[in-house]
Amino acid sequence: MKTPDCLLDEPMVLQGRRIHWIESKASFGDRYEYEYNCKNQLIPYTELFGPGAVVYWTGHIDELEDAEGIYLYDGSITDLKLRPE
């Protein structure tokens, strides 16, 4: 079974969103990359662990919308704070 890069012991809140995991991608999130990642990793993670965050460190196109339970971030996430639920 595949697991996310960071599977949280307890849910955390990031920008008002409850997350259970974080997946890190050292790639740019274009439509093809995001749809591929959703199908092969991210949607299965939401089914197993609940909602989570995917970070495209080099950014993503603005037109991408969060899939259900999957929240998109870029490298600026390092400026954000996680807090306990």
Walk through the language-model features, giving the residues of each.
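A short acidic/basic microdomain associated with nuclease active sites
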Residues: 1
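Metal-dependent nuclease catalytic cores in nucleic-acid-processing enzymes
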Residues: 46-58
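Domain-level recognition of nuclease-like catalytic cores that cleave nucleotide substrates
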Residues: 58-85
